[in-house]
């Protein structure tokens, strides 16, 4: 019995080592870990996104200051959906985060439609691990995307400087899935940077040219296909079809 148990432990350890060896950065950086998201982790990322969507839908998200220097707010949204978790989006984000590549890839849904994608990274000269940095940095990374609202003027169209924000609050985006990795890179001054890398994929994609991220209205969920979310006062969900 003890021998069988020892063999099982050895096999599991060998499998873990093989998986780690296969998970290499494709750009020469040193791979240090990939986050295996628990249900709690997924809910945390969902909550970050939905709370920022709620702020925008409520008309409380920051906007560029006016000419008089006063604070401004983004207009409220009529039809912004509450996000749910997308397993396929998560799987693709996981695979891309594992490459450590700081560029977009073409994530697609089951139908082959392109998904939206946000990338974020945070760096430190202090080495820790993937779980610790995810816990400490994941909120800051999503918040960094949302903070682009301070640069976004509603109706101005797509901009590279505000595209993370507009994807986060794109009204008819209904699902998100993310992946997170941790790696080390060395800069031109031979300084080691330990980097947390968050990839989030969105379905359906946002950031279409000549379209606004949402409709402006103080009235909520007026579309007959929508009803109010039970979790967020200013967000909507699709009505469930009644069974015959």
UniProtKB/Swiss-Prot annotation:
It holds the Pfam family CAP. Belongs to the CRISP family. Venom allergen 5-like subfamily. SMART domains: SCP (SM00198). It comes from Triatoma infestans. Keywords: Glycoprotein, Hemostasis impairing toxin, Platelet aggregation inhibiting toxin, Secreted, Signal, Toxin. Salivary gland (at protein level). GO terms for cellular component: extracellular region. This is Salivary antigen-5. Its main location: secreted. It comes from the Eukaryota. The keyword Glycoprotein applies. Inhibits host platelet aggregation induced by low doses of collagen. One of its GO terms (biological process) is suppression of platelet aggregation in another organism. The keyword Iron does not apply. It is found in: Secreted. GO terms for molecular function: toxin activity. Residues 46-202 form the SCP domain. InterPro entries: Allrgn_V5/Tpx1_CS (IPR018244), CAP_dom (IPR014044), CAP_sf (IPR035940), CRISP-related (IPR001283), V5_allergen-like (IPR002413). Residues 1-23 form the signal peptide. Glycans are attached at residues 106, 172.
């Amino acid at each position: 019995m003890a021998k069988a148990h020892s063999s099982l432990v050895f096999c599991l350890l060998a499998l873990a080592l093989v998986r780690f060896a296969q998970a290499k950065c494709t750009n020469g950086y040193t791979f240090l870990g990939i986050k295996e998201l628990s249900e709690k982790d997924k809910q945390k990322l969902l909550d970050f996104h939905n709370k920022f969507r709620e702020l925008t839908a409520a008309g409380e998200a920051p906007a560029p200051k006016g000419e008089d220097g006063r604070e401004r707010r983004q207009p409220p949204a009529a039809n912004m959906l509450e996000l749910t978790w997308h397993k396929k989006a998560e799987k693709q984000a996981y695979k891309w985060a594992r490459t450590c590549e700081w560029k977009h890839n073409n994530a697609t849904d089951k139908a082959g439609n392109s998904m939206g994608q946000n990338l974020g990274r945070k760096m430190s000269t202090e080495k820790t691990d993937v779980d610790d940095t995810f816990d400490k940095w994941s909120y800051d990374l999503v918040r960094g995307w949302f903070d682009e609202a301070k640069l976004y003027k509603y109706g101005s169209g797509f901009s590279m400087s505000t595209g993370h924000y507009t994807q986060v609050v794109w009204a008819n985006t209904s699902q998100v899935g993310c992946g997170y990795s941790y790696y080390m890179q060395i800069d031109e001054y031979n300084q080691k940077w330990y980097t947390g890398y968050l990839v989030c994929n969105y379905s359906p994609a946002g950031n279409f040219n000549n379209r606004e991220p949402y409709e402006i209205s103080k009235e909520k969920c007026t579309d007959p296909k929508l009803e109010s979310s039970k979790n967020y006062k200013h967000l909507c969900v699709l009505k469930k079809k009644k069974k015959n």
